[in-house]
Amino acid sequence: MTSNRKNENEIINALSIPAVSNHSAQMNLSTDARIEDSLCIAEGNNIDPFVSASTVQTGINIAGRILGVLGVPFAGQIASFYSFLVGELWPRGRDPWEIFLEHVEQLIRQQVTENTRDTALARLQGLGNSFRAYQQSLEDWLENRDDARTRSVLYTQYIALELDFLNAMPLFAIRNQEVPLLMVYAQAANLHLLLLRDASLFGSEFGLTSQEIQRYYERQVEKTREYSDYCARWYNTGLNNLRGTNAESWLRYNQFRRDLTLGVLDLVALFPSYDTRVYPMNTSAQLTREIYTDPIGRTNAPSGFASTNWFNNNAPSFSAIEAAVIRPPHLLDFPEQLTIFSVLSRWSNTQYMNYWVGHRLESRTIRGSLSTSTHGNTNTSINPVTLQFTSRDVYRTESFAGINILLTTPVNGVPWARFNWRNPLNSLRGSLLYTIGYTGVGTQLFDSETELPPETTERPNYESYSHRLSNIRLISGNTLRAPVYSWTHRSADRTNTISSDSITQIPLVKSFNLNSGTSVVSGPGFTGGDIIRTNVNGSVLSMGLNFNNTSLQRYRVRVRYAASQTMVLRVTVGGSTTFDQGFPSTMSANESLTSQSFRFAEFPVGISASGSQTAGISISNNAGRQTFHFDKIEFIPITATFEAEYDLERAQEAVNALFTNTNPRRLKTGVTDYHIDEVSNLVACLSDEFCLDEKRELLEKVKYAKRLSDERNLLQDPNFTSINKQPDFISTNEQSNFTSIHEQSEHGWWGSENITIQEGNDVFKENYVILPGTFNECYPTYLYQKIGEAELKAYTRYQLSGYIEDSQDLEIYLIRYNAKHETLDVPGTESVWPLSVESPIGRCGEPNRCAPHFEWNPDLDCSCRDGEKCAHHSHHFSLDIDVGCIDLHENLGVWVVFKIKTQEGHARLGNLEFIEEKPLLGEALSRVKRAEKKWRDKREKLQLETKRVYTEAKEAVDALFVDSQYDRLQADTNIGMIHAADKLVHRIREAYLSELSVIPGVNAEIFEELEGRIITAISLYDARNVVKNGDFNNGLACWNVKGHVDVQQSHHRSVLVIPEWEAEVSQAVRVCPGRGYILRVTAYKEGYGEGCVTIHEIENNTDELKFKNCEEEEVYPTDTGTCNDYTAHQGTAACNSRNAGYEDAYEVDTTASVNYKPTYEEETYTDVRRDNHCEYDRGYVNYPPVPAGYMTKELEYFPETDKVWIEIGETEGKFIVDSVELLLMEE
């Protein structure tokens, strides 16, 4: 190193240090002889015992060399690098490992035990011997890879050496001695991870099987996280333990921070870049952390003059120095201009110094605006000195810490400083000098290269420097001014240059603009610098980039992030964009950041760029203002070969991830059917030209995984080949003529008619279903299937899962003892295909699944367990249900139900699975047993209640009919009696599931039995009542109207209201000539006058019922009969023909409003169906009794022709008619 400095000084003649003699030896200061002794300082000698140059040098050298071999280096680079490592860590002479250990011991003033020291050093020596042997065997094999013997030796040594490291690492992490051993641990961990990388680089060539390579790779990933978190945790522990109260403790604290950043954290930041699957080509990494060399102040005062050391000269407190010197987290910037202000400290004309008392520093981020900071006193009478740093790397500073004595008061300041610079864009270099003048004072030289030496001594320091000056702060006291230089690693370039032939990592603190809500925060210790934190919903930051290609080239983009919730991210570079892409959460809310918290947001859609561009990152789904952390952005150049290799590695990783590590013939927990389809798409899109054999092998594995998925799925027809397909073997209950829905539901899907099955699209590889909305919540869109009891295992948890492309108001139920229910709203997108990519349609119209596409929320799992609310916006969903004991006779099973009951609702879903998850243990087992017992107790109570209600309902139904043939009504049976019996039938609870009333419940069979007889009764009653719509439930349908009349709702009944005497309502009715009929009318008269209901034939034979407001109700006989051969022709057509016949004889207002409504409208049963106000197609109307004031009158009528007319009118006031019946008498 000395030769390099000499070389530099010979080239730069103007850089010689001023010849400032030590006048103190010649001075005669009789007033205070001690002043002379206090000024005796050997210039140029820094004897601070805390600094160990060899320790720092080794750490810097190793980190610098590693930066050059990241990703997949050339074989020659690896051989050379390992030779370098062995020479650095196991050289001839004193053991560097012992120096690492002693250096940290001195900093923290804690020594490890002798046993720990001896054991660690002995084990390290053994590792060194083995590593040297491995390195030599690797070189031999790289020279002749076909040599079987060399390959065999290398294979054996590799396995043994990796195992040695695995066993040795705990010896460098002894409890209560973690901090002093930390630098040893970090260097050993680095070697272990580099060794594990060799399995991916060379393993297949020197004999490792694919399973062994995968195992070593997984160990590398695991150990990377373990070693990173360990080093960061114990670094922070050691640093916090050194936190003190005074300036001297701060000096030691800062030295620990600096030296262990160089020897530990810089290595840790590079660990993830050893992953050859993530970095399959040469990779450029950057360290943006900032470190601080020691303050430029006297530290080597002679014995007895300790007060002249800067930290004893009334220096500020620990916390004051930390606040003044250490910059808060910030964007990376570069100094452009330094203006130094000076004051004079004079004892005499022969003892004085003009020294640095304050400064103003102008800095700029990459492509950002200029910022200015001032420190110390800038209001002085001496002309300031201005130094220009624009586009210059200051790689070395040389500064004098001056000491002057005024009477008994020491003055600490810097009278002279030199800044050696180099322009990294060209060969220019030089130096800048600060000095105003000084003489007769003591000086101590501080050379930054003592604390931050170059990466190598083999080249001049202006080429091999490791750090550049980034900022200057100032420690200020009454008679103290001590500048502190901060430095960044030279790997953090000034231009954010993106390479066209290697992966480029750009830390996001190299941005030039952060939008509101975004800030820089301290890194967790393993990121190589500070990171970005944001809670914005929109644009996050902007940064300048320089692509070294002049023509457009495509790059893949990925962002390293940590998030406690799902995130939709977009990166824009110039006019090219990745489009929005969804990424899952990586950590829990309020969890501390660890290496496990970070993962890559990798965009499948690349960008095209060249030259100078501006890049931006934005988030589009953070309405809740959640916090996200970003570390860096990476650009991977895309070439045909790289793309094929990248796709192959991605597909291999995806296929391997389908199966468990212990059993490659068993699916891993959490692998879904949709996931398998997605992996099959990856494999199918592999290049036949580059990897045909691998593609075939992977395709066989994926097919096997799909078969395993099909075998475990308990759903019938999960691929939606049909809906509502009747099996050939469904049984029928002969007594009730009731098809066993339980049986048919166990053999496929059943649903409403508006559901459609669609072939696969760009989201689904297989069939999927579309569930539209509905206009009436009582008639929802539904899809269901039953998992039969025989398919289930006792005391087991099962999981329903699937993929939802998009949905709104989609309700999902799993029903056994009770219902597990979730409502999911999953937003979709108009297209998953970016506008900039090729057409997503194949030659035959099929989706081109190999075209680049983006997803809005991929792989976001929504697992709903034990009543938890399922997060919205999750395309993957899962819902669990627990099964207790199995009862094949009861056949309770599990109902799987999808339902939409809103007009706006909709859903597109597929890849549905119902699979066994795990046996129930502990609390879950106890919980399902309690639920089962509660359900059985409820069932027993229901059975007792059902027996009573059924008996009452059956008696009422039987009373409607003449006998048990149920084909003739009793003569006195009227519509009110039928509805009263129907109401009793509907008191039978749990005839159908409240969640979906087309699914039968435990009492469905007896309900359908009685309900069928009610329907028969209504049919028979309709057959003998020849008046159509006589209860006006269908408005004025089948009636002819003259004048103004209306059908209104009164007491929950439909009534005809005739408010004017000139109005008239009539109906022509066909009858059986010579037979007897009873005309029965229930009505109410308001006001004066009479209400009249007249029956007549076309010329004569007229009779009439009259209603008045002040008369008593009369009782009429109710004998009725049937006209079976005629009523078979009654219906809508007959109604229309009767009206037509009537129009031939009478004038009819054919424009009268007709508001049709179903004859038996569904209504709410608040007394028996509290959990569901909709009864689907059950034929029951809540028929209330006739209100007080209404009268029922009857007359007998014997028509002589086949047609009669019934007319309704009044003389004045208002006439309200509840019903009109014309009943055929029995013969």
Curated annotation (Swiss-Prot):
GO BP, one annotated term: symbiont-mediated killing of host cell
GO molecular function per UniProt: signaling receptor binding; toxin activity
Source organism, top-level taxon: Bacteria
Gene3D superfamilies, A to Z: Galactose-binding domain-like, Pesticidal crystal protein, central domain, Pesticidal crystal protein, N-terminal domain
Keyword entries, A-Z: Plasmid, Sporulation, Toxin, Virulence
Keyword flag Transport: no
Role noted for this protein: Promotes colloidosmotic lysis by binding to the midgut epithelial cells of many lepidopteran larvae.
Remaining remarks: Toxic segment of the protein is located in the N-terminus.
Family, per entry: Belongs to the delta endotoxin family.
Protein name: Pesticidal crystal protein Cry1Be
